[in-house]
């Protein structure tokens, strides 16, 4: 059973470096999405995106995304729940998040009810 409800206030970016500039030191969850906004991979940055993608790493992601129209979505979260939010999102969408290797086989020990606000990515379930 979820023990806490949290609304994620999503922000959309066309480059990882833009997202990093907006959330340099704030704990956040980020989504790498396709050009239609469909979530493909979830990540957490418990110390902000500057620490997670410092220096040339952000630019390397921008270069890899160049011409694809792929998107990055970021939602600030309290650092105390950053890992739990990432785990919950991966668990709920484990069938389609093939780029997330951890968290797809066992439900998180700390369960959260997540709601999505702002400019949210599209979270889709796999066709059954």
Where are these regions (language model features)?
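Boundary/linker segments flanking structured domains
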Residues: 1-40, 45-128
């Amino acid at each position: 059973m979820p023990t806490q409800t949290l609304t994620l206030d999503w922000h959309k970016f066309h480059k990882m470096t833009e997202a990093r500039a907006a959330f340099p030191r704030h704990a956040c969850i980020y989504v790498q999405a396709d050009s239609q906004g469909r979530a493909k991979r979830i990540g957490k940055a418990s110390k902000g995106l500057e620490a997670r993608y410092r220096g040339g790493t952000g630019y390397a992601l921008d270069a890899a995304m160049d011409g694809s129209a792929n998107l990055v979505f970021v939602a600030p979260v309290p650092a105390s729940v950053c890992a739990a939010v990432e785990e919950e999102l991966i668990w709920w969408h484990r069938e389609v998040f093939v780029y997330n290797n951890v968290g797809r086989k066992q439900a998180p020990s700390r369960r959260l009810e997540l709601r999505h606000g702002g400019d949210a990515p599209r979270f889709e379930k796999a066709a059954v």
